[in-house]
């Protein structure tokens, strides 16, 4: 089996089931790699592009990220109890694929796991999905 030292797993905050996490955990257990859980989040209404980037918007973004970090910790704690080394990160970034790529480079990840979702042809023609 290929040697991995760091695995990045992108968590979808809109879903309860996390198939990518199951696959990343499986690989981390077999290779002894550290596991990084990442939520890369953005909300256009809190982004500050439509309105001025006020102190209240900044606080709201910080609160949202803190809630996402807490969710990541809930996912990470059972994995740590199983002996895995798990780190958690929630970042505010748009577009998501660039945020994931930047985190993968910064963390020196050997492999990235992310769930996929089916989108209809009509949806794909009008929207950019990540």
Regions inferred by a protein language model and the residue ranges of each:
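A short acidic, glycine-rich active-site loop
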Residues: 55-70
């Amino acid at each position: 089996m290929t040697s991995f030292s760091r695995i990045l797993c992108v968590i979808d905050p809109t879903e309860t089931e996390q198939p990518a996490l199951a696959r990343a955990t499986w690989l981390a257990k077999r290779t002894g790699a550290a596991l990084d859980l990442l939520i890369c989040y953005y909300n256009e209404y809190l982004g500050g592009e439509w309105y001025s980037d006020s102190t209240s918007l900044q606080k709201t973004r910080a609160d949202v990220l803190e809630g996402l970090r807490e969710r990541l910790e809930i996912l990470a704690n059972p994995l740590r109890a199983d002996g895995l080394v798990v780190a958690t990160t929630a970042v505010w970034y748009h577009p998501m694929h660039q945020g994931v790529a930047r985190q993968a480079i910064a963390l020196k990840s050997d492999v990235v796991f992310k769930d996929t979702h089916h989108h209809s042809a009509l949806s794909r023609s009008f929207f950019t999905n990540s």
